[in-house]
Amino acid sequence: MQHTVDIQAIESKLNFTFSHPRLLITALTHSSYRNEFPSAEEDSERLEFLGDAVLGLVVTEHLFLLFPALNEGLLSTTRAALVNAEACFEYTQKLSLGEHLLIGRGEKMQSHRGKISAYANLFEAILGAVYLDGGLSPARQIIVPLLPDKESILPLMLVNPKNRLQQFTQQTLKVLPSYKALPWKSEDGSPGYHVQVFVNGDLWGEGFAGSKKEAEKLAAKQALSTHDNKN
């Protein structure tokens, strides 16, 4: 049995009225629902793609204006923390949008991780629909109030050891760390990376992991543990 959509209730939560409600219905339609009800003309995946870009732009603009002295690296990492799946899941929860998701019966039995993904995609798809219907301004008016305040955003910059190391070396030595990645294999033969972090040409730390990004974090963490007395 197909479900009906309470468009007015969703518009009230978004504080936005759609000129083309079909866009909203598409944004709510999970691919699993379309598989069960082929009469659903389109699912939300294309709108998710668009909404992801809209979210990234609005958050980037917000951080750029909020922190005029912040460098590109810290801006990038902070943005990542505000646009990832967990963050989008929280935005969906704040707006109570999850109850409107049109999703297949099988998908409803997924794990919590599956729910996070579905709700995150829903938020992005709705942003895509809002953008197509009304432009960037209403999308911005939805996104920005959901973001943490300035004081709450600041700690996000220091969660990543790479950011903490960069801040430490800039403050104490006025230089940036550099990373060198080498191929590496774990004991079971799985490929990965051996990353070394250098400061002023000196080796400060090393990290070994399956992904380059994780190996860089481990190298930065080791560097901090041996050079920053506060850690």
UniProtKB/Swiss-Prot annotation:
Its EC number is 3.1.26.3. The active site is at residues 52, 124. Its cofactor is Mg(2+). The keyword Hydrolase applies. GO terms for cellular component: cytoplasm. Residues 160-229 form the DRBM domain. Gene3D superfamilies: 3.30.160.20, Ribonuclease III domain. The keyword Magnesium applies. It is found in: Cytoplasm. Pfam families: dsrm, Ribonucleas_3_3. GO terms for molecular function: double-stranded RNA binding; metal ion binding; ribonuclease III activity; rRNA binding. Mg(2+) binds at residues 48, 121, 124. It catalyses: Endonucleolytic cleavage to 5'-phosphomonoester. Keywords: Cytoplasm, Endonuclease, Hydrolase, Magnesium, Metal-binding, mRNA processing, Nuclease, RNA-binding, rRNA processing, rRNA-binding, tRNA processing. SMART domains: DSRM, RIBOc. GO terms for biological process: mRNA processing; regulation of gene expression; rRNA processing; tRNA processing. Residues 7-135 form the RNase III domain. Homodimer. PANTHER family: RIBONUCLEASE 3 (PTHR11207:SF0), RIBONUCLEASE III (PTHR11207). Digests double-stranded RNA. Involved in the processing of primary rRNA transcript to yield the immediate precursors to the large and small rRNAs (23S and 16S). Processes some mRNAs, and tRNAs when they are encoded in the rRNA operon. Processes pre-crRNA and tracrRNA of type II CRISPR loci if present in the organism. Belongs to the ribonuclease III family. This is Ribonuclease 3. It comes from Chlamydia trachomatis serovar L2b (strain UCH-1/proctitis). The lineage of its organism: Bacteria, Pseudomonadati, Chlamydiota, Chlamydiia, Chlamydiales.
